[in-house]
């Protein structure tokens, strides 16, 4: 009997997790079954169970691969790495413009799956514990929360921002608002109701621009004076406007 190579195992498992990802885009995460994956891959039941013990084991590996494939951590570090030359408002503008880019690109991909996992967590916390328990890699939003909390605390200590709440409360607000925007945009994209007068506003870039303005107000961000500030504000504004102009 020929020896099974590591490459063979990796390729087989990737076919299984790729099938799971495709199915999660077509259906809700909670309704994807092991039989669905068997049918999609063409593998036998034993061929699937050889590598994974159940559907949640597959989801866990799928999410790990998603986090490796689509990461915004370097972009977060790049923006926060300019804290000495950019004002807090400019940093906030750039972070949220980056999030708008990410949400637009992944709205019906990773963002959809992430949202449906949060719904599953409410209904079946035992399953989420199994799915997420073995994942060591820090997710995009977890990393953003950790890094921005450090940044806000540092800027407050330097007197560059003047928030009327602590960093933990501020990040809790941002996280909750982001989750609401994510849900609204996904639902609007899946079940667009043309009679709703707000439908046209339920777009990632538009709503995240509103959140940016709210956060800048909450932190009391002060723009530095001079040409650089004007130039930076104009450049950041363009980050938000570019897609809005394309949609009009």
Question: Which residues does each predicted region cover?
Answer:
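N-terminal positioning helix adjacent to the helix-turn-helix/winged-helix DNA-binding module
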Residues: 5, 12, 16-19
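Helix-turn-helix
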Residues: 15, 23-65
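Hydrophobic alpha-helical connector segments
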Residues: 61, 75-112, 167-174, 204
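Predominantly extracellular/luminal regions of secreted and cell-surface proteins
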Residues: 70-74
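Amphipathic alpha-helical packing segments from all-alpha helical-bundle domains
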Residues: 89-90, 108-116, 123-158, 169
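C-terminal peripheral helix-coil segments that are non-catalytic and often amphipathic
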Residues: 97-101, 146, 150-158, 172-248
């Amino acid at each position: 009997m020929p020896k099974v190579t590591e490459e063979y195992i990796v390729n087989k498992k990737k076919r299984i997790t790729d099938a799971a990802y495709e199915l999660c885009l077509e259906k809700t995460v909670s309704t994807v079954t092991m039989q669905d994956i068997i049918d999609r891959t063409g593998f036998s039941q034993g061929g699937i169970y050889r590598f994974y013990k159940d559907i949640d084991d597959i989801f866990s590996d799928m999410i790990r691969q998603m986090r490796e494939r689509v990461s915004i951590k370097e972009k977060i570090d790049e923006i926060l790495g300019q804290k000495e030359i950019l004002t807090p408002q400019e940093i906030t503008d750039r972070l949220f413009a980056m999030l708008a880019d990410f949400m637009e690109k992944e709205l019906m991909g990773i963002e959809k799956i992430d949202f449906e996992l949060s719904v599953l967590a409410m209904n079946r916390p035992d399953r989420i514990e199994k799915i997420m328990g073995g994942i060591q890699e820090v997710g995009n939003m977890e990393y953003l929360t950790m890094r921005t909390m450090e940044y806000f605390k540092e800027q407050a200590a330097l007197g560059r921002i003047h928030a009327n709440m602590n960093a933990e409360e501020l990040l809790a607000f941002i996280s909750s608002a982001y989750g609401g925007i994510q849900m609204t945009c996904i639902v609007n994209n899946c079940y667009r109701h043309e009679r709703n007068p707000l439908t046209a506003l339920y777009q990632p870039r538009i709503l995240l621009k509103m959140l940016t303005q709210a956060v800048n107000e909450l932190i009391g961000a002060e723009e530095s004076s001079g040409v650089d500030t004007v130039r930076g504000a104009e450049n950041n504004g363009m980050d938000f406007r570019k897609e809005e102009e394309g949609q009009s």
